[in-house]
Structures are given as C-alpha cells and as structure tokens.
C-alpha cells in the first residue's frame, strides 16, 4: 500500500465546497468518484483544507491510499484526462504512509480581490467583488496592518469528530 499526495487546483463556482455534502456536489466527491472509477476500487481522498461553496483553490493538498502499481507521479496525468475542466491535479507524488495533509506545517494564503470601477466587468464576476463606491485606500492599508503576522484560527474551527482524528 502506498500513499499518494495530490496538489489540487479548482474553480469552486459549481461546487458546494471541498467536503462531501448531502445537498450538493463537492470537489472531494468528484475526486473520489474519478479515482474509484480509474482504480476499480472504492477510493477516498483526505484533504488538507476545506473550502466553502464557490471558493477556489490553487494548491489544496489531498492524499489517498492505493495498491496500484502505477508510479505516484503518473496519477496527475491519468486523473486530469478524466476530471472536469474546473478541477486539475497540479502534481502527484508518493509520501510516507503516515503523512496527513491536515497536520503538516503549511501556510495558507487567502486572496480577496475588489474590482472598483463604475461598471462591473462580466469576465471578472466570478473572481472579484465589485464595489462601485470610492475606496479609502489609506484606511484599508491601515486596517490590513492588523492582519499581518502568524495567526492561529483554531478557535474558529468546529469541534473535532472521530473523522477528524487519525
């Protein structure tokens, strides 16, 4: 048995988020289905970070376990030919069996874009927030200063369930 790490990029517009939900299509569900069909056995990915509905990701990390003889580095190619165009595997590689993406020391970067013009641009509507009124950039910079640095958001997470434990 080997553990394969996937670096996943996706446009979350058409998804209810990362994690499988009973009321909508999730990125994790699409990956599970794609892997299961490709490998011929039920396969589930474990993700590093959950995203909400409509949120995009450039490098979310996920792992799955497999007995497949195919080299781990080839999974990105195999999956990308089967995945919808709004989900892509940027990289795949073998990692130690005890590697868990949620418990690795990682840096998460969140990017929010404000499109400040007289009229919205329809090509930017899915990736920016349109704001018509003038922005006070000086106050925005001052406020942003409070966000700089290492911050622990553990107090914001939901209580752990048995699924959260390894």
Protein language model features and the residues they cover:
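Conserved small/polar residues in nucleotide/adenosyl-binding loops
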Residues: 154-161
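Catalytic/RNA-binding core of pseudouridine synthases
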Residues: 1-150
